[in-house]
Amino acid sequence: HRKNAGQSRAIRSGILAARAPVIGTLDGDGQNDPADLPDHYRQLTRADAPESLKMVMGRRTKRKDTAWKRFGSTFANNIRKRMLKDDCDDAGCGVKALYRDSFLQLPYFDHIHRYVPALMRADGFDVEYRDVNHRERRTGTSNYTNFGRLADALSDLRGVMWLIRRRRNPGGMDEL
C-alpha cells in the first residue's frame, strides 16, 4: 500500500496476493513467534481434521504487555465472546492458519481481523484455538489504546452482530 491502510487491509491484501490454499498470518511487530505457525498448519491440515475446520487461531499466553493493556483486552474479549458466542478468548492474536478461499468468502470491513472467528462460525466453519508464545514488541508502536479501541469496537460489534443475523449458511453446495 502507498500509505498505511490498517491491519485488516494488510491481511486481506496479503491473502489476495497469495496463491497457496493455506495461509499463515502474524502481526508485524515481532510479538508473535513465527515458530507457532507450523503447529497451526499441522492442526489445520491433519488427516482427522473435520472438513468444516477452516482456521486454527492463536491464544496468547504469558502476554508481554502492560497490566492495563491486558485488562482492556480481557474485558473487550469477554464482551465480544459473550455477544458473538464464538468461543474466542483472544480476538487480537495475529497467529492464524486458515484456508484462503474460506477467508475470502467473508465480507470485508476495516477491523475484520478481530471478528474472523465469529464470521467463520456464522458461515458454518469450525475454528480451533491453540496456545502461542507472546514476546516483547520488537518494532514500531501500537496504534491502539484501550479507550481509542472502545468506540470502534462497539460500532464494529454491532455491525458484526447485524451481519451474522443476516447470513444464511446453505450448509454446502451440490453441483447440478
Predicted feature locations:
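Juxtamembrane C-terminal module of membrane proteins
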Residues: 167-176
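Catalytic donor-sugar/metal-binding loop of nucleotide-sugar-dependent glycosyltransferases
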Residues: 108, 112, 118-135
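Acceptor/aglycone-binding surface of glycosyltransferases and processive sugar-polymer synthases
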Residues: 2-17, 22-25, 34-114, 135-162, ...
